[in-house]
């Protein structure tokens, strides 16, 4: 019989990462209300981007939650040479800068090379390191030395405990503003799964933890015969989000699209824009319930 559970269990807590947005700051922490990292997979035609932004604005003016707009200027890691990649660095950053100033949303976008770090940091409020590149030391260094907050996705083949070394790598380059993102784990060929305990384990590192719901729903490499697009199961967006939010995390990362079947990239994983209001409302409700409970007591493995 355990007489003193505090001797075996520790309160689960995290540091805070403050995003200095164009109109207000957003504090990202596992103890704060959930933040939404929301938008398109890649910058598409302006009409598609505008439709997405208008609905995001409508939904979040109603629900009063913090939102960060995300979109890529270049999908550099597509499987096929036929896959659409986006507008590229110069045009893409110009469009993201317009979105930031016109809609007043903080911007999250990813980079793939060291040379992109400085120009991306001039526009983006959070720099994202893609999962496949999360161990690239030169890329981590270039991103860290911009002194911008970093959103680092856990590679699909890594164990959660391996992410501690990546946090330490960022810290060694002078950047302690790190958010770790779970985006699913490889489970055989063409399949990803979410292990909720991965989120709980990474919370021991005392940094904010996010869940990339959309890409955890992906079927890599099995979307079509030509392998131009990945498959996915976006109809499970809310159940998977619930699994992550129940762990008391800082943010959810969700891609949406007005017509997912016509999306340039990962349309099978994208939440239909028409479902955004419903999904956001239910995520907020569960997050409030979870964070209203006493601090979770989690055994630290020795």
What is the role of each PLM region?
Residues 54-58, 62-63, 82-108, 143-149, ...:
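Alpha-helix-loop-beta-strand connector modules within alpha/beta enzyme cores
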Residues 2-36, 94, 290-302:
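N-terminal amphipathic alpha-helix/helix-capping segment at the start of soluble metabolic enzymes
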Residues 146-256:
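Catalytic alpha/beta core domains of metabolic enzymes, predominantly
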Residues 33-37, 66-70, 106-108, 125-126, ...:
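Structural preference for beta-strand elements that scaffold enzyme active sites
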Residues 42-56, 87-94, 231-239:
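Glycine-rich anion/phosphate-binding loops
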Residues 82-90, 128-133, 192-193, 217-246, ...:
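Active-site-adjacent loop and "lid" segments of alpha/beta metabolic enzymes
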Residues 86-88, 102-116, 125-139, 148-160, ...:
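Catalytic beta/alpha-barrel core
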Residues 36-49, 67-89, 256-266:
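Glycine-rich, proline-tolerant flexible connector loops at the mouths of alpha/beta enzymes
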């Amino acid at each position: 019989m355990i007489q003193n559970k505090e001797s075996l269990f520790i309160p689960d807590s995290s540091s805070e990462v403050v995003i200095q947005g164009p109109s207000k700051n957003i504090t990202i922490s596992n103890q704060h209300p959930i933040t939404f990292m929301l938008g398109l997979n890649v910058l598409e035609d302006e009409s598609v981007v505008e439709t997405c932004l208008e609905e995001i604005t409508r939904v979040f003016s109603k629900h009063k939650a913090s939102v960060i707009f995300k979109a890529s200027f270049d999908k550099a890691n597509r499987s096929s040479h036929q896959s659409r990649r986006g507008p590229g660095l110069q045009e893409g950053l110009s469009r993201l800068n317009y979105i930031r100033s016109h809609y007043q949303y903080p911007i999250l976008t990813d980079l793939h090379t060291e040379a992109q770090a400085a120009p991306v940091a001039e526009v983006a409020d959070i720099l994202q390191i893609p999962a496949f590149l999360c161990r690239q030391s030169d890329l981590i260094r270039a991103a860290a030395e911009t002194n911008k907050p970093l959103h680092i996705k856990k590679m699909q083949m890594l164990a959660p405990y391996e992410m501690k070394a990546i946090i330490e790598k960022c810290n060694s380059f002078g950047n302690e503003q790190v958010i770790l993102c779970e985006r699913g784990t490889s489970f055989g060929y063409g399949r990803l799964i979410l292990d909720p305990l991965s989120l709980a384990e990474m919370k021991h590192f005392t940094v904010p933890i996010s869940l990339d719901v959309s890409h955890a729903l992906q079927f890599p490499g099995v979307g079509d015969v030509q392998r131009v697009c990945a498959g996915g199961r976006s109809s499970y967006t809310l159940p998977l989000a619930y699994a992550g939010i129940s762990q008391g995390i800082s943010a959810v990362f969700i891609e949406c699209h007005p017509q997912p079947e016509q999306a340039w990239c990962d349309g099978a994983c994208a939440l239909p824009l028409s479902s955004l209001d419903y999904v956001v409302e239910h995520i907020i409700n569960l997050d409030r319930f979870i964070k209203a409970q006493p601090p979770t007591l989690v055994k630290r493995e020795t």
